[in-house]
């Protein structure tokens, strides 16, 4: 016998083997090494064929999935700040408790925009959110795309040139308006103000339903804001009559109240000296964060635009290389990722929400402290897509990474905040960012509306809700403390009454023996378990007197709290109402002052333009006179 299995034929093992095992071993030993190699080779071939068939079946399944109208997923990067995560979680819980969070608005980024608009003041953001929900119901915003048909769009664009054209270098859509060519009088002749406002809202809804998701898929990062270019060449008082001012006021109110923080940055180009003077004055009334987004440029604006926009995405009339000649010009082309049929198909099938979203959670120093990689499987009926799970496994090289993907579950953002809080210590360990574990999580699309009152209380996370400050809350707290005190007194009373007889009957010898027994374990134990010092005997009457005294004190405190009035005194209420009225009056005066200042500045701009024209005319006259004198000589 030869081969590596001969070592098992030694006599010393025969005593430990049963007769059946010996027969099996003998039959195995009779096979030659060539036969075993042949068998191993056939097994390898079968394994290779099986894996090939499995791969082909995965490809066929993915092909069938695409032919059924579904599209492959896209990995989208979504960078989030840990503090913003915690703030959004608190805001979301507050909305859930007040039943102000419909399913279609249960979105992390939407709630974050409202928080940013109110500087992360949860109460103010909640009021703004509630007003938005009410406005959408009254205005019919949820169905405006299907219900409203703006037939006069072509005529409107002639008198109010505006369009979306391309994306900037970060993937945001570019919105362009040529304000110098706006004719408000003609605009109000072809449409009404109410219809134009509805058209404006419809375009905003279309942006959130089609344009922003398309840009998100194209850029592979979350997009929910735009870059705006305003061409103010030729703008004058004729462009800002009463109807134009009323329209702008209505549009700004709708945008600011219901679509906050959708402007990434704005470039005002071809701005003359008068406009710059006006802007420097108006800038002082704006929020510094808002004014930082607005860049007022002169006539040499191209280099600044090319820093953020590729030349092929910029229209020719703004100095770019795009003409869109085959689509009637850049103002009519509506160029962008939302015109790509494949991307639109993904958007209509929920690709932007169901994509494989790679979420990076950053700490205050900008370091990645956690990852979340939601892996949505495309499901139709009961057919789960094993192809995508297989591709996920192929992308991960290490066994540890594959193991982390073995238990997939969908988690709402409140758990992301918890994870962010628990992993806040990661930044203090060198090399931690390089080996962050990957966790499958659903980010926006899978939140369920269910009440959750508890907050995350770990380090760096959210604290528990604030204690109510009204008198009813104080009474409740006092009552709880009183009940806890009664329980403690009752427990103490029972303990003392049980131990008193045992203490009186025990002899000094037993006490000494117990002390010796405890001390035999070591010096430290003897120090901790020394016998108690003698105390005077407490009678049942003394205990009852003590408890009665404590109860009397607590009753006095509760009576003091109850005697305080539950309502604000009339004098203070009057003072508060007077202060509110004064604030309203000051706001009205401020609005009137702003309006007068605006009109004065516009008048000043006209005067400056008139002076420039007069100086130019005088200069031309002087040139002509000089030419005549030279000709005479």
Swiss-Prot record:
Compositionally biased spans, kind Basic and acidic residues: 19-38
Localization (cell): Golgi apparatus membrane; Cell membrane
KW Membrane (keyword) present: yes
Protein's job: Required for transport of secretory proteins from the Golgi complex. Catalyzes the transfer of phosphatidylinositol and phosphatidylcholine between membranes in vitro.
Lineage: Eukaryota, Viridiplantae, Streptophyta, Embryophyta, Tracheophyta
Coiled-coil portions: 571-593
Name of the featured protein: Phosphatidylinositol/phosphatidylcholine transfer protein SFH8
Keywords: Cell membrane, Coiled coil, Golgi apparatus, Membrane, Protein transport, Transport
């Amino acid at each position: 016998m030869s081969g590596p299995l001969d070592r098992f034929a030694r006599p010393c093992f025969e005593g430990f083997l049963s007769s059946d095992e010996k027969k099996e071993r003998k039959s195995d030993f009779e096979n030659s090494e060539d036969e075993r190699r042949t068998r191993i080779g056939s097994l390898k071939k079968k394994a290779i064929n099986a894996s090939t068939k499995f791969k082909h079946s995965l490809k066929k399944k993915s092909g069938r999935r695409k032919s059924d109208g579904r599209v492959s997923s896209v990995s989208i990067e979504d960078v989030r700040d840990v503090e913003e995560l915690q703030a959004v979680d608190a805001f979301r819980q507050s909305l859930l408790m007040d039943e102000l969070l419909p399913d279609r608005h249960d979105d992390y980024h939407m709630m974050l925009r409202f928080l940013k608009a109110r500087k992360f003041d949860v109460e103010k953001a909640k009021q703004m959110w509630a007003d938005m929900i009410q406005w959408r119901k009254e205005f019919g915003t949820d169905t405006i795309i299907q219900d409203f048909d703006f037939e006069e769009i072509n005529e409107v664009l002639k008198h109010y040139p505006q369009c979306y054209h391309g994306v900037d270098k970060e993937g945001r859509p570019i919105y362009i308006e040529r304000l110098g060519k706006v004719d408000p009088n003609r605009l109000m002749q072809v449409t009404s103000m109410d219809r134009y406002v509805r058209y404006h809202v419809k375009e905003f809804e279309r942006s959130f339903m089609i344009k922003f998701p398309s840009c998100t898929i194209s850029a592979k990062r979350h997009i929910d804001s735009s870059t705006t270019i305003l061409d103010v060449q030729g703008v004058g008082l004729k462009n800002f009559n009463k109807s134009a001012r009323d329209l702008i006021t209505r549009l700004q109110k709708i945008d600011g109240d219901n679509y906050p923080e959708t402007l990434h940055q704005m470039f005002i180009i071809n701005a003359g000296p008068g406009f710059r003077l006006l802007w420097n004055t108006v800038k002082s009334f704006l929020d510094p964060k808002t004014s930082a987004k607005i860049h007022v440029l002169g006539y040499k604006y191209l280099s600044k635009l090319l820093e953020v926009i590729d030349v092929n995405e910029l229209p020719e009339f703004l100095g770019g290389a795009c003409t869109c000649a085959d689509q009637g010009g850049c103002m009519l082309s509506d160029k962008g990722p939302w015109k790509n049929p494949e991307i639109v198909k993904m958007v209509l099938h929920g690709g932007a929400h169901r994509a494989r979203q790679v979420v990076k959670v950053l700490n205050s120093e900008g370091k990645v402290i956690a990852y979340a990689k939601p892996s949505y499987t495309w499901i139709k009926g009961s057919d789960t897509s094993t192809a995508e799970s297989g591709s996920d496994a192929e992308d991960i090289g290490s066994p540890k990474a594959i193991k982390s993907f073995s238990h997939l579950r969908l988690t709402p953002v409140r758990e992301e905040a918890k994870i962010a809080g628990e992993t806040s210590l990661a930044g203090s360990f060198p090399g931690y960012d390089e080996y962050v574990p990957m966790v499958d999580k659903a980010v926006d699309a899978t939140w369920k509306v269910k009440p959750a009152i508890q907050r995350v209380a770990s380090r760096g996370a959210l604290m528990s809700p604030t204690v109510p400050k009204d008198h009813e809350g104080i009474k409740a707290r006092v009552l709880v403390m009183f009940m806890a005190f009664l329980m403690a007194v009752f427990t103490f009373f029972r303990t003392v009454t049980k131990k008193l007889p045992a203490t009186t009957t025990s002899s000094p010898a037993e006490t000494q023996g117990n002390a010796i027994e405890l001390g035999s374990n070591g010096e430290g134990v003897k120090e901790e378990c020394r016998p108690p010092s003698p105390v005077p005997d407490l009678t049942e009457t003394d205990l009852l007197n003590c408890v009665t005294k404590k109860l009397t004190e607590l009753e006095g405190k509760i009576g003091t709290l109850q005697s305080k009035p539950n309502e604000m005194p009339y004098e203070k209420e009057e003072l508060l109402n007077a202060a509110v009225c004064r604030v309203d009056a000051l706001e009205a005066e401020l609005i009137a002052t702003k309006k007068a200042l605006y009109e004065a500045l516009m008048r000043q701009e006209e005067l400056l333009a008139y002076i420039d024209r007069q100086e130019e005319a005088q200069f031309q006259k002087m040139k002509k006179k000089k030419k005549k004198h030279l000709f005479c000589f």
